[in-house]
């Protein structure tokens, strides 16, 4: 068995898509991999260890070296700005960051309020637009903010738009497209460059094949 590579994976939808991509790339993951309730999963046959983390924490684990590599959404990378290498766009978990609010609602006051779990991204975006806003940090149920008068607008991830629609909100501005990325700890890359390069190349072949098919 070679050097064990530790990979941080986000729990939830991205995890399932990423596991499927790893299998397509030829990694033999156990059948119960996606259904496991463990937070650390060892796959000795592939010299792999997986750490299952909250999506917003993956870049932290990779930056601090407890994981050599990881899979993280571009939204998290933009918000956290961690010291990691972004090696590959995996082209999975496609969505986008957007501004949304109640239809026909006007901006309120001198500094309208914007609720989001991406305060850094939102601040940067509105600064670039030349708009002064007050950012309100929330950790979930962002769509609730305009409905109860907490904020004039929200900045959040939009996938199908169904959640916005169900809450009577409309998208007003498209900020940027989001996909999941293969990221690497800089020190780990110096120590385990061969095995990391192999994983990146195997994943890249699958992605390139899907794009040309």
Swiss-Prot record:
Spell out the GO cellular component terms annotated for this protein, sorted alphabetically and separated by semicolons.
cytoplasm
Main location class = cytoplasm
Q: Write one Gene Ontology MF term.
A: ATP phosphoribosyltransferase activity
Task: List localization entries.
Answer: Cytoplasm
What keywords are assigned to this protein?
Amino-acid biosynthesis, ATP-binding, Cytoplasm, Glycosyltransferase, Histidine biosynthesis, Nucleotide-binding, Transferase
Assembly and interactions?
Heteromultimer composed of HisG and HisZ subunits.
Query: Know anything about its domains from the record?
Result: Lacks the C-terminal regulatory region which is replaced by HisZ.
User: What PANTHER family is this protein classified in?
Assistant: ATP PHOSPHORIBOSYLTRANSFERASE (PTHR21403:SF8), ATP PHOSPHORIBOSYLTRANSFERASE ATP-PRTASE (PTHR21403)
Q: What is this protein called?
A: ATP phosphoribosyltransferase
């Amino acid at each position: 068995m070679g050097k064990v590579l530790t990979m941080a994976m986000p729990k939830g939808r991205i995890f399932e898509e990423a596991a499927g991509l790893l299998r397509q790339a030829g990694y033999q993951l156990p059948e119960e991999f996606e259904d496991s309730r463990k937070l650390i999963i060892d796959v000795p046959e592939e010299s792999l260890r997986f750490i299952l983390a909250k999506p917003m924490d993956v870049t932290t684990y990779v930056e601090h070296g407890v994981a050599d590599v990881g899979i993280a959404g571009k939204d998290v990378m933009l918000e956290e700005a961690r010291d990691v290498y972004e090696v590959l766009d995996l082209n999975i978990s496609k969505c986008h960051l957007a501004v949304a609010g109640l239809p026909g609602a006007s901006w309120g006051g001198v500094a309208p309020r914007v609720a989001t779990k991406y305060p850094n991204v939102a601040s940067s975006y509105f600064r670039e637009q030349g708009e002064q806003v007050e950012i309100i940090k929330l950790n979930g149920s962002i769509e609730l903010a305009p409905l109860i008068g907490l904020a004039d607008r929200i900045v959040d991830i939009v996938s199908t738009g169904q959640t916005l629609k169900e809450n009577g909100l409309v998208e007003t501005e498209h900020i940027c497209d989001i996909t999941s990325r293969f990221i690497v700890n800089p020190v780990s890359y110096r120590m385990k460059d061969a095995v990391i390069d192999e994983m990146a190349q195997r994943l890249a072949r699958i992605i390139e094949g899907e794009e040309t098919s």
